[in-house]
From Swiss-Prot:
Source organism (scientific name): Crucihimalaya wallichii (Rock-cress)
A UniProt-annotated Pfam family: S4
Keyword Amino-acid biosynthesis on entry: no
Domain of life: Eukaryota
Protein name per Swiss-Prot or TrEMBL: Small ribosomal subunit protein uS4c
Length: 201
């Protein structure tokens, strides 16, 4: 299944706010309609919608998300929390959380086009897994820095999660540590996502 490229507002109207996909928010009226429908939802549909919420927020294909679930299942600790850590530590998501991009798809473009360096080397793989003490910088070229500066100026000021530090004037971000569960930027029940996949096998 390919990455979603359809109308974004259609997705947030059904699934709720997906800040990684779009900065738009569902209207209050649409929330009420969804709540009235939710009474009739089956447990399967509830799990499916949580899975879809995760997939669309992080901009993943079904195959990519399944791969992350399998990796998380083999790791020590809670599968759901490890899954969120894996997704949050992707380079495209780190750029989004630093405020260097307005959405994760936008951050992915920055990476794909060679504007981003990790520890002094260009990384053009959006799924690159960042680690504590990684230094993320914008390429030292005018078009790269102007592009990112415009995105920083356009983004609404938000408090950075404690696992990240941003030095705006140096166009530099620092990964301090693995993200805490409480700092994940999406309202999600990750256990339902794990349950969804466990029932598919």
């Amino acid at each position: 299944m390919s990455r979603y490229r359809g109308p974004r507002f259609k997705k947030i109207r059904r699934l709720g706010a997906l800040p990684g996909l779009t900065s738009k928010r569902p209207k209050a009226g649409s929330d009420l309609r969804n709540q009235s429908r939710s009474v009739k939802k089956s447990q399967y549909r509830i799990r499916l919608e949580e899975k879809q919420k995760l997939r669309f927020h992080y901009g993943l294909t079904e195959r990519q998300l399944l791969k992350y679930v399998r990796i998380a299942g083999k790791a020590k600790g809670s599968t759901g929390q490890v899954l969120l850590q894996l997704l949050e530590m992707r380079l495209d998501n780190i750029l989004f959380r630093l405020g260097m991009a307005l959405t994760i798809p936008q951050a992915r473009q920055l990476v794909n086009h060679g504007h981003i360096l990790v520890n002094g080397r260009i990384v053009d793989i959006p799924s690159y897994r960042c680690k504590p003490r990684d230094i993320i910088t914008v390429k030292d070229e005018q078009n790269s820095r102007t592009l990112v500066q415009n995105l920083i100026d356009s983004s609404a000021p938000e408090e950075l999660p404690n696992h990240l530090t941003l030095h705006t004037f140096q166009y530099e971000g620092l990964v301090n540590q693995i993200i805490d569960r409480k700092c994940v930027g999406l309202k999600i029940n990750e256990l339902l996502v794990v349950e969804y996949y466990s029932r598919q096998t």
